[in-house]
Amino acid sequence: MWSRRFAVAGAVLLGAVLVAPPGAAAAPTVPSPAALAAAAPAGLIPDRPSPEDVRRALVRVERASHGKVRLGVVGRTNEQRPIRLATVGTGSTRLLYMTQQHGDEPLGTPAAVRALWALGVPDSAWHRWLRSRVTIDIVVQANPDGAVRNQRYNHDPSASGDYSEPGVGYDINRFHNPITPIEDNPVPESRAILRYWHATHPAIVVDYHMQGRYLQPDGRETTASILWPTSPLAGPAAVDRSRQLAVRNYDAMTYVAGANVTRYPGGDYEGIARNAYGILGSASLLVELSDLPQEQTAFQIRTAFVSMIATAQGAADGSLWRVNGDRADSIPARGPSLPDTPALRRADAA
């Protein structure tokens, strides 16, 4: 449930970004974060959904939206499962979100399905305005073969070499390298996302993952971490926009969702989606949700939901590009692993 403090803060923050620039027509009043979150019906999708759960939920969203949410497939896995795409909006600014590249990191997926309902089913003036300004593509559960096995990797018994578990599969999030010819990429999930990027050239890419549990220097537990491209191959303009995107998400996740957000200690390898799509020119961001106890699952899903909505709003009215990206340097470091949580430790390098 949204506390009154966060509901008020969220209304102020999300309303402020919808103020039109001088000379532009005023945007319609934004619904409160609580109202947006409550739009999706209870039981729309489980917290840790199977591929079949995802299919059923997306079909339900599409039908309820009367065509405003459009469904598709960007590719198929080695087991011929569809890599599902859902799209809302018709605007000229394109956004690409992806969830669950690692099959055992599920919470971005229910957040995405609920965001699709919240943005695509209601038909207020604000909803029509937003959909006219942005097109949001979401690769929902990018690794369905891994999801059915609750494993990080895709399914490929022939996998070998770097960034693989031999006999198990490949780490999808190491195979977005924009320098490697797509036809030489051994990972069908990564190939599909790369091809879709080249077909649409999104201005913004946000990749949703999960991580272990960590303590900030002040003793609070990190509930989410974020990071922009750090590869030296990413151009300065893309990095600057990515840092603005990071600050926008930090503010929304902190002051609207109530998350404790830190800076993810990621590497600079160009095959990581965060880096790859920055190299290609998008504003690119990694969002990591901490693997908290079950009673905090709804909170974590809400954090990702807020990130998705805030990014869409900032892109729709352009306020995202007026954010001071230098503030990204003040996002606190993630901190050390939380002790005595062996069941939640994971190889979580995104």
Regions found by a protein language model. Give the residues of each.
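Short beta-strand-to-loop junctions in surface cap/lid or active-site-entrance loops
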Residues: 84-92
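Alpha-helical scaffolding within the catalytic cores
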Residues: 80, 153-158, 267-274
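Active-site-proximal beta-strand/loop segments in catalytic clefts of secreted hydrolases
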Residues: 74-76, 88, 98-101, 139-144, ...
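Short glycine- and acidic-rich boundary segments immediately preceding or forming the N-terminal edge
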Residues: 28-79
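C-terminal accessory segments enriched in acidic
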Residues: 7, 29-50, 185, 189-192, ...
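Active-site/substrate-binding loop(s) of hydrolase catalytic cores
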Residues: 92-96, 106-239
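Secretory targeting and sorting signals
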Residues: 1-28
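Short glycine/proline-enriched loop/turn "hinge" motifs that connect secondary-structure elements
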Residues: 88-89, 161-165, 276-282
